[in-house]
């Protein structure tokens, strides 16, 4: 307390002494604003997909890089799917402004029997209604990192199941990494940390990363248990900042 008052007293005395003469003060003031702007993570998606029918018909569904609107946009919307059908979609992900961790989740929205047809009953299907469908037990799925974004699997160890010739690329000497394979029922409500499969372990800003998803209803001589059934899911991609490695889907 004494030190404070002493400092004030010295200033006061100097002020009184200088007041006795005429003074010109020199001064120089430097100023600059200080602002805070929150950083951002902006994930955009584009899609290139193909649907091969068992009878040779081919359909395409694509959209350019954009923010998705779940009420309007869709990755696939297929009716009248039959044994022997297959499809592939390559999802291109673009992260802007900052690097981040990438996450992927499958949120199943329907798995319905839609009534029991006579062939279904003859095949032994006795359940009907919502969440009693069998379609997810017949469709194989695989997910891989499509490094060259060409909508084809450049495999090294081979394709985990049949795999249409127009889908695979090369002669087995490719290096694209297979991330998951199984049936639809096995991926239901699953989520993945896709960053662990990326160089460096995260998404760089202003880079393009492609992931392929291939599905196939095999074998073609299957029974009628899944006739008229339907299955649907919402695919979710999310990014988190590098100082937050918690799964946003848990």
UniProtKB/Swiss-Prot annotation:
First and last residue of the signal peptide: 1-26
Domain of life: Archaea
Pfam family, one: Peptidase_M73
Swiss-Prot/TrEMBL keywords: Signal
Cross-referenced InterPro entries: Peptidase_M73_camelysin, Signal_pept_SipW-depend-type
Record NCBIfam families: cognate_SipW
Protein name: Uncharacterized protein AF_1661
Lineage: Archaea, Methanobacteriati, Methanobacteriota, Archaeoglobi, Archaeoglobales
């Amino acid at each position: 307390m004494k030190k404070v008052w002493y400092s004030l007293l010295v200033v006061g005395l100097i002020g009184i002494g200088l007041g006795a003469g005429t003074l010109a003060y020199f001064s120089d003031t430097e100023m600059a604003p200080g602002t805070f702007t929150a950083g951002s993570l902006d994930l955009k998606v584009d899609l290139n997909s193909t649907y091969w029918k068992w009878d040779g018909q081919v359909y395409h569904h694509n959209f350019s890089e954009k923010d998705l609107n779940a009420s309007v946009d869709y990755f696939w919307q297929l009716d009248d799917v039959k044994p022997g059908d297959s499809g592939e979609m390559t999802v291109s992900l673009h992260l802007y402004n900052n690097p981040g961790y990438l996450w992927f989740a499958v949120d199943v929205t329907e798995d319905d029997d839609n009534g029991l047809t006579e062939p279904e009953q003859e095949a032994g299907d006795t359940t009907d209604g919502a969440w009693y469908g069998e379609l997810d037990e017949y469709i194989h799925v695989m997910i891989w990192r499509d490094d060259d974004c060409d909508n084809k699997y450049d495999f090294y160890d081979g394709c985990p199941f049949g795999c249409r010739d127009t889908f695979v690329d090369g002669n087995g000497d490719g290096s694209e990494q297979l991330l998951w394979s199984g049936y639809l029922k096995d991926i239901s409500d699953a989520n993945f940390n896709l960053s662990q499969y990326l160089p460096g372990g995260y998404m760089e800003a202003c880079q393009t990363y492609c992931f392929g998803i291939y599905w196939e209803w095999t074998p073609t001589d299957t029974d009628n248990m899944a006739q008229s059934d339907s299955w649907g899911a919402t695919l979710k991609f999310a990014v988190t900042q590098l100082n937050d490695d918690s799964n946003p889907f848990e």
